[in-house]
């Protein structure tokens, strides 16, 4: 009887010590840098999306890390479907897209197609003549809202695929 008790105690101790080792054996941190594909080592923002891709905004482009490889997105003046600027300030996720604030506008990246759309948030839809500060957020209803220094608040209208200004008294002060 006593031997059975000892065997049970030893069995419980073995399970208690082996289980944590097994469960943590696959959690390996990997260092990524410009040596293995990151566009720049100076990171401005990081987001893990719903599919567990890590999006890294740097001073020299946007990077997507899926656990195996890094895909980069950079500005190209000859490609209107490229990101609007290489300085990535903020990344948020909403309704299957990533919204990216750069020093030269807001961009939407469709994660499924990897198509990028630029939004300059001006009435003439041209590139701003100077860098602006863009801050992105989501409303309680899931709308994308953008605050632009010197211009005020804008809300994204999905049906028109554009940002519309929000009239507020304090935005112009």
Where are these regions (language model features)?
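Carboxylate-rich, polar loop motifs that coordinate divalent cations or form catalytic acidic clusters
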Residues: 1-173
């Amino acid at each position: 009887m006593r031997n059975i008790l000892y065997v049970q105690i030893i069995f419980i101790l073995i399970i208690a010590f082996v289980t944590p080792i097994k469960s943590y054996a696959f959690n390996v941190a990997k260092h990524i840098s410009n040596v293995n594909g990151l566009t720049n080592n100076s990171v401005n923002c990081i987001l893990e999306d719903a599919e567990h891709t890590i999006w890294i905004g740097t001073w020299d482009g946007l990077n997507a890390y899926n656990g195996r490889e890094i895909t980069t997105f950079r500005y190209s003046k000859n490609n209107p479907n490229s990101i609007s600027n290489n300085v990535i300030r903020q990344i948020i996720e909403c309704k299957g897209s990533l919204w990216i604030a750069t020093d030269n506008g807001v961009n939407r990246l469709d994660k499924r197609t990897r198509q990028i759309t630029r939004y300059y948030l001006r009435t003439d839809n041209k590139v701003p003549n100077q860098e602006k500060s863009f801050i992105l957020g989501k409303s309680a209803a899931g709308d994308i809202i953008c605050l632009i220094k010197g211009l005020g608040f804008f809300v994204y209208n999905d049906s028109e695929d554009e940002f519309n200004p929000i009239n507020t008294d304090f935005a112009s002060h």
